[in-house]
A protein has these predicted regions:
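Short hydrophobic alpha-helices and adjacent helix-cap/hinge residues
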Residues: 1-260
């Protein structure tokens, strides 16, 4: 964003001042940050992720607000419509291909019958994805169980409660869980539960995989993070008229896990 402003001739420290504040992965910090930026009489506010955008929306109807990394702006109550936002807010959505991600889980674990959907109960963006995941799981002929947490320190016990109860876990683009993926992946690995996540930035540990979609391609391709050619053979590239799907995964022990 700062680079884009600079390209347009607005350079921090020269003709504009950019004040960056972080909520430090705590949604409860967002309202006070919004107050600070409004009290400074900011000319424009960029809000990253749904909790920040929601906090700013509650505080001002006058200052122009851009948001990004929001799953469903209209569904989260930020705008009247995703096609015509109206009011003082507009921005971009990072909606992930939930149905394709669930299908990926089914491809990796063909015998899967039950899937857990795990997210933080305070994040409306995650609830939207959870509803989509439930529908996708049903369409794949599987059963879903929803497991919510209110803080990352509940993740380990939540995952442990799923051991032996589900065939894999689906985690949407949930800010709380994304920030705590080290804890999540360690617990899932210890319990032997494969985990499908909402975006590639959450893939970095064992038992994690995702699929992401970009436009302007006539062919779907799959990209792997894997140490085994045998594992690579688990997925096949398929074709599409409009989109490119990339699969990011780090599942070095999935074949052993699924047969043990």
């Amino acid at each position: 964003f700062s680079d884009g402003l600079a390209d347009a001739g607005y350079v921090d420290g020269e003709n504009i001042v950019i004040h960056q504040l972080s909520a430090a992965a705590e949604a409860s910090n967002c309202p006070s940050i919004a107050d600070t930026l409004i009290n400074e009489k900011s000319d424009l506010i960029l809000a990253v992720a749904t909790p920040c955008a929601s906090a700013v929306k509650e505080k001002t109807a006058d200052i122009p607000v851009l948001f990004t990394a929001v799953t469903d702006p209209a569904g989260s109550g930020l705008v009247a419509s995703n096609d015509a936002p109206g009011a003082n807010l507009t921005g971009t959505s990072d909606m992930n291909p939930v149905a394709q991600q669930i299908a990926l889980g089914k491809q990796l674990i063909p015998d899967a019958k039950k899937v857990a959907i795990m997210y933080c109960s305070s994040e409306s963006n995650s609830k939207i994805q959870s509803d989509l995941a439930e529908a996708a799981i049903k369409e794949q002929g599987m059963e879903s169980v929803v497991k919510t947490i209110s803080a990352i320190d509940e993740a380990k016990s939540a995952i442990e409660s799923l051991k032996g109860q589900v065939d894999f876990i689906y985690i949407p683009t949930d800010n709380t869980l994304a920030d705590g993926m080290t804890t999540v992946s360690a617990a899932a690995n210890e319990c032997g539960i494969p985990t499908i996540v909402g975006e590639s930035g959450m893939v970095g540990n064992q038992l994690l995989a995702t699929a992401s979609t970009t436009t302007n391609s006539a062919k779907q391709r799959l990209r792997w993070r894997s140490s085994s050619s045998r594992e690579r053979q688990s997925l096949q590239a398929c074709r599409s008229n409009t989109r490119q799907t990339k699969v990011f995964w780090r599942l070095p022990s999935i074949q052993k896990l699924l047969t043990s």
